[in-house]
Amino acid sequence: FWRCALSALALMCVFSVKAQPVNSANMDPYLWLEEVQGDKALAWLRERNAVSTALLQAQPLFADNRAKVLEVLNNRDQIPRVTRRGDYLYNFWRDAKNPRGLWRRTHLEEYRKVQPKWDVLIDLDALGKAENENWVWGGSDCLAPDYNRCLISVSRGGADAKVTREFDIAKREFVKDGFYLPEAKSQLDWVDINTVYVGTDFGPGSMTRSGYARIIK
């Protein structure tokens, strides 16, 4: 008897529950933060960054730690990290004299020396000054096997969105009418000297909600 009564009561409870409409705003009061480029989201970001920066700078060890980190970063005796391409070792170097950095290369024999000589390919501080831009290095992709043509990416102030241009190492200049992608969260990769894969904003539906390329052409 009791088992039947409890079963009937449970069944009545199931049918008596009324479905409630789903309100996404009530479920997540911060849903507007998903608009990564929205004015409200960016304003909130700047506000929270200011609060966090003030808290960090108020710490007793902040100034001392900052000075020590800068000393390490600007130490010219640190071993440069390199990428080998053909006969050359490539490195991107930043220090107090070159805050935006130098993209440079050298030979293995020279690299083994205590004070190697470097061939500077791009001075990012000079480039930014010449173009009146706050360029931050985004990387290089050079075409094998001779590695003479490279796709150089830079961003404004270190943003995720980058500008990509084709660079001629032999001439030490960007290629006139060469491969170029305007500022976007994009990707450009070599196929051959005349062809590249492109992932960028091709119009409606070509980008993810976070602003990255959904389509490669």
Language-model-detected regions and their locations in the chain:
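Beta-propeller folds
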Residues: 6, 15-217
